[in-house]
Curated annotation (Swiss-Prot):
Family: Belongs to the ribonuclease M5 family.
Lineage: Bacteria, Bacillati, Mycoplasmatota, Mycoplasmoidales, Mycoplasmoidaceae
Gene that this polypeptide is encoded by: rnmV
Co-factor binding details: Binds two Mg(2+) per subunit.
Name of this chain's protein: Ribonuclease M5
Pfam families, per database record: DUF4093 (PF13331), Toprim (PF01751)
Domain Toprim: 10-94
Amino acid sequence: MDQKARIKIDGVIVCEGKTDQAKLQQIFDVDVITTNGSALKKETINLIKKISEKQTVILLLDPDQQGKKIRSKLEQHLTNYYNCYVDMNARLKNAKKAGIAEMETSALIAALNNRVAITKNANQSILWDQYLSLKLNDKKKRLLLCNNLNLPYFNHKQLFKKLNLLNLTFQDVWKHLK
């Protein structure tokens, strides 16, 4: 894509490395901060936290175990941000890795179009008893719900936490299960 055809994104995207940054800036007109992979420094976390107080922060990390660890670490420090998830199977045909730099352009555009707003508050939007009544201990139901919400698959307890981070109520979750 040439400079004129890049898609404008408001906010700042957080990704893992320089090759991810280069790929994202080929496609999008956006500011990017890199975590330098698992070498995530306290200074970088503080920078991202400060930026999140003034503008939109979008976490677009690799869909591998390392990306999940980095996302989890950042989530501990942020209160308002967006999560983007890319399907690991959306990588380029000859790619050996499954990082953002190796993803199909269409998958990255879709991930940003389906970004999920996260706002942490002290109150739970769905209670554990309500969650249990939805029978989400069934893996098929969790997969259905995650697909309908454009989220990656989460285990039982992780999904409960994510639903609260998304501020989804019992009624919201019920609608997405139909």
